[in-house]
Amino acid sequence: MAKKKIKRRGKMPPNIFDTGGQSWGQQSSGQFSNAFKGENLGNSIGSIGGAVGGIAQAGISNAQIADTSGIEAQNKAQKNMVVGASSNDDLMSEWGSWNKVKDDYSWKDVRGGSTGQRVTNTIGAAGQGAAAGASVGGPIGAIVGGVVGLGSAIGGWLGGNRKAKRKAKKLNKEAKEANERALTSFETRADNIDTQNDFNMLANFSAYGGPLEFGSGAIGYEFDNRYLNNQEMSAVAKQRLTSLPNSFQALPEMNTYNAFAEGGGLSREKNYGSKKKPYPSVPSGDFAGPHRSYPIPTKADARDALRLAGLHGNESVRRKVLAKYPSLKAFGGSLFDSVVGNNFNQSFTQGIQGMFQQEPEQTVQAANIAKDGGDIKIKEKNKGKFTAYCGGKVTEACIRKGKNSSNPTTRKRATFAQNARNWNAFGGWLNTQGGDFTNGVTFINEGGSHEENPYQGIQIGVDPEGAPNLVEQGEVVYDDYVFSDRMEIPDDIRKEYKLRGKTFAKAAKSAQRESEERPNDPLSTKGLQAAMERIATAQEEARQRKEAHREGNEYPSMFAYGGDTNPYGLALEDPMSVEELEALMVQSGETGEIAPEGNNGNRQTWTRYAPIIGSGLASLSDLFSKPDYDSADLISGVDLGAEAVGYAPIGNYLSYRPLDRDFYINKMNQQAAATRRGLMNTSGGNRLNAQAGILAADYNYGQNMGNLARQAEEYNQQLRERVEAFNRGTNMFNTETGLKASMFNAESRNAAKRARLGQATTVAQLRQGIKDQDAARRSANITNFLQGLGDMGWENEQANWLDTLAKSGVLKMNTKGEYTGGTKKAKGGKVRTKKKKGLTYG
């Protein structure tokens, strides 16, 4: 074989790895295998496990948002707030102490943590991943591990931002709803207080009697007015003309009208034109009765002629009328074509009625859409447009908005929606009393999804543990089993069970249609039950598959459905084995065979810098971090408003009604006059006897009159005192009750002030404690960082001393592991010298 000349770069020998050593970007073939050998397996697994835990913890920390339970509690308390004021003063006091909850949270308010902390977590995750990768795969493993750690931390960061935005939106929605409910509670209480004040004024207005003078002043005026109005309406219903002299005589019956049973013109006062130029007329043969013709000098008469001519379908009259008034073609042509051609005797009335009920801008064809009667029909393209205009739900506010719209179509739709809401306003059959015949299938058509619903779903009963059963819009319920609208039917299950629809809920809807038409048919019921059981079985099978797949993902050693065996690798499309990689590196021709490394058995020493790195990163994060006062803000956000109470004053007062003395005096006068007349009649003409009797009677009359006056005065005085005492007691009771309520409200306000003072004190103490802890943490991080730097410098100083000793020959090896030899007498011993033999003279 011919020798090939190898070009050298400079004076570097071609085989630069003959003596071993580290190489950048390449490792020996035993690097990966050594990491998982028996003696190194524990360290490798521990390093990887620790790195994975740290990376996962960094991602979770970056994705975590602040605790919003305090904000949610505030919203709930605001939503359930009840205004307890019973007077205007209490209402104003409670209104003054009430505060709206915040409803403009941004995603930064609920994000929690700080940017510096997340930066620190990201750097730490990347460092842990790089360290774990380096312990297994060298520099390439370090790069891979760093990328994995960095991706996990950044993914958690971005996921936390999205989660905070959704949470802020939800909190703002709940806060706005709570504020609206609180304002509604204030408005309702204000209306109730105003009504109670009116009742109190009415009770006190005539506490001592007197005419009320309501209405028009006459007693029973309002009742009589309503009675007369009802009589008037009754007369109108009976076709009585109440304003005419014969208003109490009914009009003639309909069969006495000139109903043209035998034909004739609609009006006798017609202009027949001149003899030379008479108006076109309808001959008598075209009418129901003879001896009449009908001129058509005007369009109104022409319309009448068209209607009358249509009785017999006379085309000649129709042509005459339309020749004189061509404009009636668009009005009456198609109408009477359909009338004549479709059994006029049955549909004439409906056709005319539909024409006169049409709106001016509609055409005659539009007037004929309901000429045969039936339900109201809405075009398919127009269905749901007004509901969409209202945002999915038609309300009174949306109807008012639509009726005030500048678009005439929107106004018509709003009017139709308003009328449709009153179709059952006066009652109707609600399918009660056993008349609700269903097949047992329930459709959940409203409520939104579990994520959209503020109550996490629509409750349908509770389970044996008391937890509510929640469903969402789109699902179908049958026999306490819910068919999901989220789970899509796999193709193999759809073919096996012969299901229709994309989801199991749609399949259930399709399967129940036949039974919906015949809910009481036993065969349909059995078929429905069998179909639902088949769909339920298919859904359970699909759910079991999903659970099995989820369990396989939870335990990486199980690959029942396949998957990536190394989720943290590079996921190469064409993976290679270690032997293939070694062969590829040998064949590259750039370098020689990599010699085995001589220091593979040495332990890692770079971890001794971990405390310094950690303290440095913590100190770096302190530059961007701020103390977290969320707990203190949670306490300060609690509403400590005063609770006000009210009282209901008693309006039960007595009226003073004195004894009517004049009534009894008149009675006595009548009795005395009768006595005198009787004495005079029985005296027999003897004036002395009459005079004596009259004097005695008058004496008794005077005595009785005096007794009546005195006793009546005493009775009235006692009655006045009793009435005043009773009313005084009522006023005292009302005053005492109001005083107690005022005292309670004052004490409640004072207690609220003391509570707010305690709240402010607690918040200040918490904030100061948090501030002190933050300062101590910063000081500890800086102290540890400086202490670590000092320890590292002291270690380097000692290493320099050892290197100096090794260099001077005292030690045979320096701190880098290099052999330095040392002096020949380094081990000590006896010094041997050459001595002369013989006798020596001194």
From Swiss-Prot:
Instruction: Spell out the GO cellular component terms annotated for this protein, sorted alphabetically and separated by semicolons.
Output: host cell membrane; membrane; virion component
Give the Basic residues compositional bias ranges: 1-11, 824-842
Q: How does it sit in the membrane?
A: Single-pass membrane protein
Keyword Iron-sulfur recorded: no
Q: Where is this region: Disordered?
A: 1-29, 817-842
Q: Is DNA damage given among the entry's keywords?
A: no
UniProt biased composition (Low complexity): 20-29
Where, by residue number, does the polypeptide cross the bilayer? 140-160
Q: How does it assemble?
A: Homododecamer. Interacts with the portal protein.
The name under which this protein is listed is: Cargo protein 1
